[in-house]
């Protein structure tokens, strides 16, 4: 399963919780949230576009960094 890395402008635990919420709702993902470095690594069969759109639902600035 591909691992995608995203930069997400998270500043606190609440931001990380919002990311967890939208990813859990999407389903079919395994993820790691690196709050200090503002990165989210997602292992999923979903397309990068789907994952990016899902992360943007948090209202945070999100950018795709590439495959890990």
UniProtKB/Swiss-Prot annotation:
In-chain residues carrying the UniProt-annotated modification Phosphoserine: 47
Modified residues (N6-acetyllysine): 60
HMA domain: residues covered: 1-63
A single GO molecular function term of this UniProt record: cuprous ion binding
Cellular-component GO terms for this entry: cytosol
Binding positions (Cu cation): 12, 15
Keyword Repeat: no
Tissue: Ubiquitous.
Any one biological process term the GO annotation gives: negative regulation of apoptotic process
Keywords for this protein: Acetylation, Chaperone, Copper, Copper transport, Ion transport, Metal-binding, Phosphoprotein, Transport
One Pfam family here: HMA
Annotated domain remarks: The heavy-metal-associated domain (HMA) coordinates a Cu(+) ion via the cysteine residues within the CXXC motif. The transfer of Cu(+) ion from ATOX1 to ATP7A involves the formation of a three-coordinate Cu(+)-bridged heterodimer where the metal is shared between the two metal binding sites of ATOX1 and ATP7A. The Cu(+) ion appears to switch between two coordination modes, forming two links with one protein and one with the other. Cisplatin, a chemotherapeutic drug, can bind the CXXC motif and hinder the release of Cu(+) ion.
Role, per record: Binds and deliver cytosolic copper to the copper ATPase proteins. May be important in cellular antioxidant defense.
Matches recorded under PANTHER family: COPPER TRANSPORT PROTEIN ATOX1
Subunit note: Homodimer. Interacts with ATP7B. Interacts with ATP7A. Interacts (via dimer form) with SLC31A1 (via C-terminal domain); this interaction improves ATOX1 stability and controls intracellular Cu(I) levels.
Family to which the UniProt record says this protein belongs: Belongs to the ATX1 family.
Protein name: Copper transport protein ATOX1
Species of the source: Homo sapiens (Human)
């Amino acid at each position: 399963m591909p691992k995608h890395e995203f930069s997400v402008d998270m500043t606190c635990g609440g931001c990380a919780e919002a990311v967890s919420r939208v990813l859990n709702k999407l389903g079919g993902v395994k993820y790691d949230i690196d709050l200090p470095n503002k990165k989210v690594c997602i292992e999923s069969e979903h397309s990068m576009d789907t994952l990016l759109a899902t992360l943007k639902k948090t209202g945070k600035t999100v950018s795709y960094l590439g495959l890990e």
